[in-house]
Amino acid sequence: HAYGAFVGTRTLSRNVEDVYGSFRFEDTIEDFSAFKIKKVKEKNNAIEFEFEEGGKGKIEIATNIVRLQFESASVETNRLAMSFVCEDTDHFFGLGAQVSAEHRGYRIPIWVSEQGNGKSMQGEPPQVFGLTGAHYDSYSPIPFTLMNRPLGLELDTPHRSEFEFCVDEGPIRLEIQDSTFVLNIYLGS
């Protein structure tokens, strides 16, 4: 299942279509598997944990920031994700140079792509791939969202990632297409 506290999978195949800097990804992936925590310990002012399936993670807490990272033991696992409860009042802003100001109810890919000549509506594909842009194509995507709770969520990665915000009344879901997941949570007041 793609939704869970700690989940991972691997990409079986990837087809990337590129037209003048516009990208379209078609991935075939295995089903996501949940990682279950088996051991937790405090070490050097951090909380470290290990998964039953292998792999490990760490939570570090500093003033106004929580850094959470985890990795799978399998070298084949190259997609990791986390899900969080989405409150009815949650709103999501940011993610770099985006057309929309508020992103609740959408999946937003974080990948540099030519925006095209014109944009499609939220949730709709571009009318002519490579000429018109998908709604969330961006020359400057930034893997950081500011919420109204107040919280900031930053995926600390150079890899392709995705933010999913309460799609179909579902959870907040963050995915990094890499073998290491690093999330910085900024706490406001």
Residue ranges and their predicted role:
Residues H1-S189:
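Catalytic and substrate-binding clefts that recognize carbohydrates or anionic sugar/phosphate headgroups
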